[in-house]
C-alpha cells in the first residue's frame, strides 16, 4: 500500500464512518439504546475499526495486506450494505394498531423465578459435565486450535454455557437498581472467567457480560459516553491480555505493539477477511442457503444421526477450507457481508441488507413491548430475552447470517423450553397446594391490562 493509495482509502473510510456515525448518534440521542444502535456500533466495529490498525501494521511493520482495490471494494460494499439496511429498518411496513392485541402469555413471580433458575441450571450443569470430561483445558492444551480436536469431548455443550447470562438478566430486570446492576456484572464475569479456564481460552462470555453491563448502564443513565469510551479501551486491553494467555504468547517492546495491533484487529474487526474473500471471488462456488441448514448439524446428537458430518461446511469453514485452502484448525470469519457473498455472490448483499433490517426491526419491536409491559414479571422475561440475544447480534455482524440463524433459533428453543417448563412446574406446585393463594391473588393485581401487546 502506497501513501497515495492510503490517502484514497482514507477519504472513502472517512466518508463512510461519518455517514454511519451520524445516523447512529441521531438514533442514540433519540432513544439512548435500541437494537439499531447496537447493530450499528457492532457494524462500525467489525468493518471500520480495523482500518487504522491495518494501516499501522502496513506502515510501521511492513505487513503485507490484501491488494488495495479489494480493500476498497470491501469498504464500498460495507457502506452500501449499511445504507440499504438503514432504509429498510426505517421503513414502516404497516400502520400502528388502534386496537390492542390479545396477550399471548403472562407471567407471575414464581414462574419468572423458576425460569431464571432453569436457565442458570442449564448453563451450570453443562459446564459441570464439560469439566468432568475435560478438566481445565487452559492448562492442559498447548495450542488454542486443539479445542476443536477429537481430544476434547462434549464440544457441543459450549453452546449452553451462555444461558447463564439471560438467567442473570432476569434477576436484574426484576430489581433494576444499581445493586442488581453490579451483581449482574460480578456474577456473569466470574462465570465467564470460569468458562475461559475450563474451555481453554473462549472469551465470548466475558465480552458479552461486560458489554451488557455497559448497555444497561447507558439505558439507565448510569454511564456517560466518556465512561463508555474509557470502558471500551479497558475492554480492548483486557481482551488482548486474555488473547496472550490463550495463545501462550510472551512478547515485549515493538513485538508487543505489533501483536496488540493484529490480535485486536482480528478479534474485533476482521474487515480484511472481506477483502480477501473478494480477491478470491472467482474461486467461490456459491452455496445458496445450504450453509444455514448445515450450521444446524452441530445441534443434532450423533446418537440420532450416526452419519452426521464431523466438520460442518458453513460459510466460515467453506471460506477457510475451500476458498483459502487453509487447514490450520481455526475457521476464518468471513463477516456478515462475506457470508452473503459465499451464499449468493454480490447480488446477495442488498438482499441480505433488507433481511438484516427486518431482523433488527423485529428485535426492537419486541424490546419496546417489554419496556411498555405493565406486568413486571413478563417485562423482565421479554427484556431478558432481547438483551440475551445480544450475543447473536454480535455473531450476525462478525460471523455471518448462517451462524446467526442457527444460534438464534437454538437460543429461542432453549429459552422457550425453560419458560414452558417453568409454567408446567408452577402448575404442578399449584395443584399440589404448594403455592399460597395470597401470592396468586397479589400477582393477579399485577396482570397485564388491556393495553398489552403480547
Swiss-Prot record:
Topology in membrane: Multi-pass membrane protein
GO CC annotations, alphabetized: plasma membrane
Stored InterPro entries: WzyE (IPR010691)
Chief localisation class: membrane
Residue spans crossing the bilayer: 3-23, 39-59, 61-81, 119-139, 154-174, 180-200, 201-221, 222-242, 340-360, 377-397, 409-429
Pfam family of the protein (one): WzyE
Pathway the protein acts in: Bacterial outer membrane biogenesis; enterobacterial common antigen biosynthesis
Keywords: Cell inner membrane, Cell membrane, Membrane, Transmembrane, Transmembrane helix
Keyword Cell wall biogenesis/degradation assigned: no
Compartment annotation: Cell inner membrane
Gene Ontology annotations of biological process type: enterobacterial common antigen biosynthetic process
Described purpose of this protein according to its UniProt entry: Probably involved in the polymerization of enterobacterial common antigen (ECA) trisaccharide repeat units.
NCBIfam families: PRK02975.1
Family in the record: Belongs to the WzyE family.
Assembly, per entry: Probably part of a complex composed of WzxE, WzyE and WzzE.
Stated name of the protein: Probable ECA polymerase
